Amino acid sequence: MARTGKAALIWQISTGASVVRPNPAATGLVSTVRSKGAVAAMVTEKAPTGLVRAMAGSWHLLADVGPPCPPSLPAHAHADTFGCLVHVDKVPLLADTGTSTYEPGPVRRHERSTAAHSTVQVDAADSTEVWGVFRAGRRARVDGLTVHTGPSGITCEAVHDGFRCLPGRPLHHRRWSLTSDELEVEDLVTGRGWHEVVIRWQLAVGTAVRAADGMALVTSPAGAFSVTIGASAPVLLTTETRPVAAGFGSTTDASVLTCRINAALPVRATTVWSRERDRSAEGEM
């Protein structure tokens, strides 16, 4: 997910400020916003990466909001625009499929595809046209990136046009809202016509998932999490197992939670990840 050479900034944000606007012209800037005498948020501009890093309580989000590769070197790109990683209590919950090979073939094609990342796919297309072993053709373009922080949490949102080649020219809007209690991800696909919209959540190795009735229960070393999905059209919620990189030249299996919607655009879906309450502790109270 994190590849060098992206033409955007990494912003490191913690909760508490009203609005954060990093200075894109600065280099190595560390900006501190203060509220009522206390440090409210810190924004750190690092080397260009196209990533936003947000932290709230024990939740840690890394969102891919930059171009897939430099315009001068369309290579080593993955079709992963608006993919994200999530850790809770420093334990991976949502992970990246990773890279296990540079050899041409189905494994390399899958690991670079939109379907291999925690983002939205439209009509089985990739958000960036990846071909060969390294190259990229038509690329997703991100616009409208905004980051807001407040007393309750952090919101990051943007839109990309990586599916503009499809009939109806779909646009993918994504908003992450992170608090110390939960992560809410709102996806909106606008455009014209009937399309298949698929949202995938790539779970970390060792994480189990059960799905039924539009909800899912995810169990990881960090605990149990409920996943609820609300959408503007009927959702088919399924789980599957797919190979992910365990190292260069090796793979292992991990679970994927998939939300599939077939409907006329616009399509809106909201996915909420929250920690399950300790039922036994409640019974003792």
Can you describe what each PLM-predicted range is?
Residues 1-2, 19, 32, 100-285:
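CBM-like, beta-strand-rich accessory domains located in the C-terminal region of large
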Residues 67, 99-100:
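A generic structural motif
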